[in-house]
Amino acid sequence: VVFTFFVPPIPGCEDVRQLTPNDEKKKFLEAYGIDYLIEYPFTEKVRHTAPKDFIREILCKKLCAAFVAAGPDFCFGYERKGNVALLEKMSSLCGYEFEVFDKVSYKGEPISSSRIRACISEGQMEDACEMLDRPFSLSGTVIHGKAIGHTIGFATMNLVWPEDKLLVPIGVYLSKVKIGGNTYQAITNVGHRPTVEKDAAKSDLLLEAHLLQYSQMAYGEEIEVSLFHYERPEVRFSGLDALKEQLKKDTLACVTYFEERGNDGKKEGFVEERA
């Protein structure tokens, strides 16, 4: 059982963009074998709950917790005054077992959500992937675009960037896209399409993924896009011919990247997973 607070997203508020929004969190926890997820409403009353009251009223009375585990830096209760020392002290009084998880390090420093967020915000996708134990990804329904990619041989699957999802630097990423049980290598642009948009700065932030070795229509389909490597910034090209030539270079970079790295260091083809 995993206990977490549910904080409703606030549209348009950059401060609440999440590394893993609620829907994604549920999917990942299920994949990791978690049986139950408790999303406790984070109301004003809960926010002002004293640490000891949180343990007695929520952990013990409402959840009937028999075993509690937390990281060494875990804080809770009003003004974050509760800590693992208090959880340990109250365990005998409230009848639960308590264990502190050890910190996990990467490149000699402890892994934390703030460190992962910083890596993603700076485009350091490989480091983020290592610390997350998975690539940074997002899911959504494919929407219609302007179909300009079709005219130059680089059709894309388009997603609007979710309002509650942590932003990545604008640019082109070497990626993988999962659709219909299969996973394909892809070049993915996250940005405002300055080559084809007259007023790009005011356009929606769009994710455009060109899948290698995939040519079917996917409008209305659910896809998952995983960003493995930040390749280059988004550029305004002189025209579609120049854009096409750059996309050819990006495609070669994508193929080379995954040939060298693959999954677990193994070379693999374009289609890697089947349902």
Describe each region flagged by the PLM.
Residues V1-L63:
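Core alpha/beta nucleotide-donor-binding catalytic domains of modification enzymes
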Residues V2, E39, V100-D102, L227:
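Structural signal for conserved beta-strand scaffold positions within catalytic alpha/beta enzyme cores
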Residues F6-P8, T43, V104-Y106, S215, ...:
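Short, solvent-exposed coil/turn elements at secondary-structure transition points
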Residues D35-Y36, E97-E99, E224:
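Conserved beta-strand segments of alpha/beta enzyme cores
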Residues P41, P72, V190-H192:
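Short secondary-structure boundary segments
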Residues H48-A155, K178, S238-A242, E268:
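Classical nucleotidyltransferase
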Residues G145-A275:
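Phosphate/ribose-recognition catalytic cores of enzymes acting on nucleotide-derived substrates
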